[in-house]
Swiss-Prot record:
Transmembrane segments: none
Effect of D102A: Completely inactive
Enzyme class: transferase
Reported effect, Y37A: Significant increase in catalytic efficiency. The mutation has little effect on the affinity binding value for GDP-Man, however it shows an 4-fold decrease in the affinity binding value for D-glycerate
Nucleus listed as a keyword: no
A matching Pfam family: MGS_C
Gene3D superfamilies: Spore Coat Polysaccharide Biosynthesis Protein SpsA, Chain A
Cofactor: Mg(2+); Ca(2+); Mn(2+); Ni(2+)
Family membership: Belongs to the glycosyltransferase 78 family.
pH dependence: Optimum pH is between 5.5 and 7.
Protein name: Mannosylglycerate synthase
Naturally occurring in which organism (per UniProt): Rhodothermus marinus
BP-aspect Gene Ontology terms: mannosylglycerate biosynthetic process
Cofactor, free-text remark: Divalent cations such as magnesium, calcium and to a lesser extent manganese, nickel and cobalt.
Length: 397
């Protein structure tokens, strides 16, 4: 018996309502809940349509506003945690699903695959899917890089899409997350990082099911569209950097299929707009803060005041930069947040121009090997990462 949840904010009503109908008609789903950020056009559309969908499918459908549960910017975290609270306190269902509201390729298989994995005993089921080689740059350059550098011996950096909003969890896992103060506090985009980290830290068994058609959803323009998400996802990693992950988590993955051509050939962001953005919004204090970084990074970013530059930010320069950011970055400080954005942008542009342009397969191989090099570097450096006893480590072959 399962509850399906769609958190939403300013989505196209027709897309969300299609997904609600798909979920409500699924034989494994006993209730559908939409969690709105505010009472807007989408909220009212769901509110009007819910009774008809309930009658047609026999599945209760409802919509409610997210509660203010966290202490950071009100956002996705409050929405997902509101759903956890409802699930635990107002229902007796055994499982809860989360799906992003803007998915245009959502179908019953998303639910079926997750349910079947849960039937096999996994506590958390995550969906993963093919992405364009220049998409998911926060995932690759912030979250998975941070996991590899800080916890190289754990499963964290092996999880395909740790920021994915498509997942199923059993009731006991939902309770464990909701009772964790770190999770409830994270009211913003960092919630996905916290869900991933805490479940691995607590040894929850994880299965990743593959969605071959990919996650079709609304796209963004320049990297500037992702600035808030970038800042909040990095801040989430920074807040966890001294945590220890001492027990291995069982982690299995469904084997991926061939990547569709329309995904392999897609460009994930507007390169021209992003290049121009590097030269904007500079302050004297940002230039002063560059003194904390290595000489190539400092001089390279200073150049960006006059013209776009990014050749200096290769993967090793980014690793060194990442450690400086972990130590010195201050969430809520406008200059630090802008500098983080510029540094990350140069890394993404460097990767795009030196790796992604060589083709999809080459780029994917590079990204996985990059994480491997980061894990190895972290394991060798004294004081970096939090290794577990070798006898406890699971094979990742």
């Amino acid at each position: 018996m399962s509850l399906v949840v769609f958190p939403f904010k300013h989505e196209h009503p027709e897309v969300l309502l299609h997904n609600v109908r798909v979920a409500a008609a699924h034989p494994r789903v006993h209730e559908v809940l939409c969690i709105g950020y505010e009472r807007d056009q989408t909220y009212e559309a769901v509110e009007r349509a819910a009774p008809e969908i309930s009658r047609a499918t026999g599945t209760p459908v409802s919509v409610r506003l997210q509660e203010r549960l966290g202490t950071l910017r009100p956002g996705k975290g409050d929405g997902m945690n509101t759903a956890l609270r409802y699930f635990l306190e107002e229902t007796q269902w055994e499982r809860i699903h989360f799906y992003d509201a803007d998915i245009t390729s959502f179908g019953p298989d998303w639910i079926t695959k997750a349910e079947e994995a849960a039937d096999f005993g996994y506590g958390l089921v995550r969906h993963y899917f093919p992405r364009a080689s220049t998409d998911a740059m926060i995932t690759w350059m912030i979250t998975r890089t941070g996991f590899a550098l800080l916890w190289p011996h754990t499963e964290l950096s092996w999880i395909e899409q740790p920021l994915g909003g498509e997942l199923l969890m059993r009731r006991e896992v939902a309770a464990m997350l909701y009772e964790d103060e770190r999770v409830r506090r994270r009211s913003d985009w960092g919630i996905d990082t916290l869900y991933t980290f805490v479940t691995v830290q607590q040894g929850v068994s994880i299965y990743e099911c593959y969605i071959p058609e990919g996650k079709a959803h609304r796209l963004y323009g320049g990297l500037d569209d992702l600035r808030t998400m970038l800042v909040e996802c990095f801040a989430a990693i920074q807040s966890l950097q001294h945590e220890v992950v001492g027990q291995p988590a069982i982690h299995r993955q469904e084997h991926p299929h061939r990547v569709p051509v329309h995904i392999a050939e897609r460009v994930g962001y507007d390169v021209e707009a992003t290049l121009h953005r590097l030269m904007q919004h500079w302050t004297p204090r940002q230039v002063e803060l560059l003194e904390l970084f290595t000489t190539p990074v400092r001089e390279g970013l200073r150049t960006c005041q006059r013209r776009p530059a990014f050749n200096f930010m290769d993967e090793m320069a980014w690793a060194a930069t990442y450690h400086v950011l972990l130590e010195h970055f201050q969430p809520g400080d406008p200059d630090w947040e802008e500098l983080l954005f510029k540094l990350w942008t140069t890394r993404v542009l460097n990767y795009t121009m030196t790796v992604a342009l060589r083709g999809y397969d080459y780029a994917q191989q590079y990204l996985y090997r990059m994480l491997g090099r980061y894990r190895y570097q972290a394991a060798l450096e004294n004081g970096r990462g939090h290794p577990v006893p070798p006898r406890a480590a699971l094979s990742t072959a």
